[in-house]
Amino acid sequence: MKILVTAFDPFGGEKINPALEAVKQLENTIGEHTISKLEIPTVFHESKDVIDKELANGNYDVVLSIGQAGGRYDLTPERVGINIDDARIPDNKGNQPIDVAIQEDGAPAYFSNLPVKTMTEAIKAAGVPASLSNTAGTFVCNHVLYQLGYLADKSYPGLLFGFIHVPFIPEQVTDKPEKPSMSIETIAKGLTAAIKAISKEDDAKVALGETH
């Protein structure tokens, strides 16, 4: 399949975004998939517009967005994006929507139609910590995951879409001793395993849920 992999520019005062740096390391062919890479701005709505423009020109089967989740220790494929922006910090253009619907005519939520459990298990099988996440937050990462579902629903029928959060890298936590980190190389290894696992097959039926 032809897969578009996107990653954000640095945000929140960080000088580097591990998602972007790891995506840069991905091979152009992973398994049976052809990979294209796209940097997107950490900006509400503009991020979606950049992806939409590329999708309109690219005839992609899949779009997989990668984002930073500082504080998480593992790679976390996301199950769902919700129709709300509630920004604790401004985006890279100073926008800070609070309790604003992303799309007035959109669904309350869009679930990733990728095999997220299979992908999570594949990351772990590659020796990289991973868990399935049921919340992508309410900042631009959730915004993009939701917008991907909206685009698939309204404009690109049959498009497969999803999102994976990645941890900080060591360079980002020299002044944050309480925060976990992971090397760019390990993040890229995990992303490669996840991408290899992408297919149109039914997802794995394994218990990866949370009790709270």
From Swiss-Prot:
PROSITE patterns reported for this sequence: PYRASE_CYS, PYRASE_GLU
Gene3D superfamilies attached to this UniProt entry: Peptidase C15, pyroglutamyl peptidase I-like
Keywords from the UniProt entry: Cytoplasm, Hydrolase, Protease, Thiol protease
UniProt organism field: Staphylococcus haemolyticus (strain JCSC1435)
Self-association and partners: Homotetramer.
EC number: 3.4.19.3
Record-linked InterPro entries: Peptidase_C15, Peptidase_C15-like, Peptidase_C15-like_sf, PGP-I_bact-type, PGPEP1_Cys_AS, PGPEP1_Glu_AS
Catalytic activity: Release of an N-terminal pyroglutamyl group from a polypeptide, the second amino acid generally not being Pro
Disulfide bridge positions per record: none
GO cellular component terms, A-Z: cytosol
Top-rank lineage group of the source organism: Bacteria
Residues forming the catalytic site: 78, 141, 165
The gene coding this protein: pcp
Protein name: Pyrrolidone-carboxylate peptidase
Localization terms from the record: Cytoplasm
UniProt function note: Removes 5-oxoproline from various penultimate amino acid residues except L-proline.
NCBIfam families: PRK13197.1, pyro_pdase
Family the UniProt entry places it in: Belongs to the peptidase C15 family.
One GO MF term: pyroglutamyl-peptidase activity
GO-annotated biological processes: proteolysis
